[in-house]
Amino acid sequence: MSAQTVSAPEIDIQEIPRARKRENVVLNLKAGDVVVVRSAREIAETLDENGTLDSLPFMPEMLEYCGKQFRVLNRVVQSTIDGAFLAGSHTESYVREFRNNDVVTLQTVRCSGAQHDNCQRACAIFWKEAWLRKADDIAEVSESNGSSNSLPRNLHLKTTTQPGKYFCQSSEFLKATLHLPMGKRIKKCFSAIAARNISVWGMMKRLFAWAWWRTYYKLIGESVRGSLEKTPTGVLDLKPGDLVQIKSLPEIKATLNSRGRNRGLHFSADQRPFCGQQFRVRNRADNFIAEGTGEMKHFQNTVMLEDVLCDSACFAFGGCYRSDLLYWREIWLRKI
């Protein structure tokens, strides 16, 4: 499916008053809080003509979660953008914060990519607080009971902007976020602790990791690098559920070039701690929408593993709270 919009029966988004859009919904959600995703009708009231709130798209893949209850995974006090995008001609900041600082992720909720030509990036979905309510808020429950949970008619949620250019939370990440200067990043460390994203000890370890790898990179260079000019391919034909062991660091280094890449894919310092451990394959990563550009990219012999997440602790002061899954070349893995 490669349509410009995805439609569903009952409300035209352009006919809905924008009262809630301008209303600052403040829930101050913390990790572990129980929330309910508002009805499709309520959420539609917050969206502009592009289907966004503060430039963050509400995607058609999110409709299935309306009315359901979840726990907050993280308050996204700060986040990072894919470094591969910034490696081009772009000079945007690597560490960013969402407009209005009111975004959370929910446990187990990831984008299926079903309405974006089956993108397999499996991003953790970002939720504005205006799209949620606290599960124990009696007044909100009463109000929500009067709202339609049926899918809005003519609710046009864009999936592409032009042929070959997709429209989603990842493609619009830069527009939905702001540069985060170092002074504010220090404050964000305290915000992350207050939001229960991380413990004080956990934050101290993150800051130590950042200082260590920043010094290492300045003095020595790439943290994990090989010596190959042309890097090899490994084919395991892995499928979801397969049990694998991540190879040792020396074995992985033997597949990399001097920039720490295997056929263009970077093996980062954040992946080092997982070497030697066993995990199950979550999904293949053959097709994914590139951060910032909206273009569909294609990988070969690459998978994502269950619960193996990037926290950017080695590169971003204070880390990242978007819980991205890491990419793994099959040549870095051993099937059990």
Where are these regions (language model features)?
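Generic structural signal for buried aliphatic residues
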Residues: 35-36, 104, 244
